[in-house]
Amino acid sequence: MRHVCGLDVHKDSVFVCILNEKGVVFQEKFGVLTPELERMVGVIMEHGVTEVGMESTSVYWMPVWRVIDPYVEQKLVNPYFIRQLPGKKSDVKDAEWIATCILKGLVRGSYVPEERIQRLRQYDRRIFDLNDDIVHKLTRLDAALQRCNIRLSNYVSTTDCKSYGDVVDAIARGETSPDALLRCVHGRIVNRHGADVIRSALTGVVTPVDVDVIRQLREEIELARRHRDECQRRMDGLCSEWFPEQYANLQ
């Protein structure tokens, strides 16, 4: 006889309901710490469950999925579709309703990639977040410079360019002389706008507090860049290990 399991996953608990064609076989509430999840897997295996269903609730489903994945086929269900199905009553527990839907074949699972792809996606999302963080911090850094009336960003193509970074590094070391800062700017920029204009743009009113803030923001940006580059290297390494032919074709 076919046995299925519905999981109602919360931040601090997982409610389990195991069903077959005759009705409820087992119900219990488990904790979310790994030993509890492993005990839950043992119960699921003891009852001969062949399919487990759970809702994609925030990130709480992910560790539950990882623990169960080596043992039983799973189905990740969109909560919207579960709630749209007719027949659910207010007094029916969520786990039992999920199990019922799985047993009757009323829902299909969302796409959950294999573990290798999940790892690559984690790195990819991290790189995306770090790039966003870098852009945000560059904006804050330029705002800190504008507060000091350092207007170099008006004359460079991007605040991520080398000249801008060199000027910021000099200020972070405590250098505020316009002539000294001018030497950090690429000659092409100076020639395009004129040395007097760039020198004026670098003549600011900089306090020791400004220097500290600029230095800290610069360090945060560099740290984010190092983390981004590390993630990219790890991602490249996994791609070359797992998909050598495809990876070679992209080089």
Model region roles, listed by residue range:
Residues 1-251:
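A detector of single, family-specific signature residues
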